[in-house]
C-alpha cells in the first residue's frame, strides 16, 4: 500500500470534521455492523486515535452516516439525524465507487500509521490469519491463484451489510 502525503490540518481534534476524517469514518462504517458503532469498541478507539477524534465522536459520525444509508432505513434503523453536508458529499462521492474509497482510505490509514510509528497492517493477511486453524499439521500443496485486490475491505463491507451472516 502506498504511503501518501497528508495535508497539514487534515486531522484536527475539534471543530468541523475534515474531508479526510469523514472519508475514514465512512470507510470504517462500511465495514462495521451498526451495533458495533459505539465508543467502547476497540476498533473505534484505535481509529479515533489515528484521526485525532474521541471514540464517541467517531461513533456518532458513523451513526450520522448511517442516517444516509437506505439499507439501514429499510431495516428501520434511522441512525442519528445530524448528517452534515460533508457526510452527504462523501456518501455521494463514494457510494457507487467502493474501489476508490478503499484505495484512498487505506493509503491514508497507512500514512497515519507510519506517522505514528505503528507497524503496517496488511488487512488481507490479517483476515486470512484469523481463519487459520490451531492444528498446523497437514498436507502441503503448491497453488497459483489470482487474488482480488482489496478483498478484505469488500468482505468486511458485505458481512457488515448482512449482519455478519450470508
Q: What kind of region is each of these model predictions?
A:
Residues 7-28:
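Short, Lys/Arg-enriched anionic-surface-contact patches
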Residues 10, 106-137:
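Intrinsically disordered, low-complexity linkers and terminal tails enriched in Pro/Gly
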Residues 29-39:
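Short helix->loop/beta-hairpin flanking segments within DNA-binding domains
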Residues 43-49:
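Short alpha-helical "recognition helix" segments of helix-turn-helix
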Residues 53-69:
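Major-groove recognition helix of helix-turn-helix-like DNA-binding domains
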Residues 70-90:
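Short Lys/Arg-enriched helix C-cap and helix-to-coil transition segments
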Residues 88-107:
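Short, amphipathic alpha-helical interaction segments positioned at domain boundaries
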Residues 126-165:
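Short, charged surface segments at domain edges that flank catalytic/cofactor-binding sites
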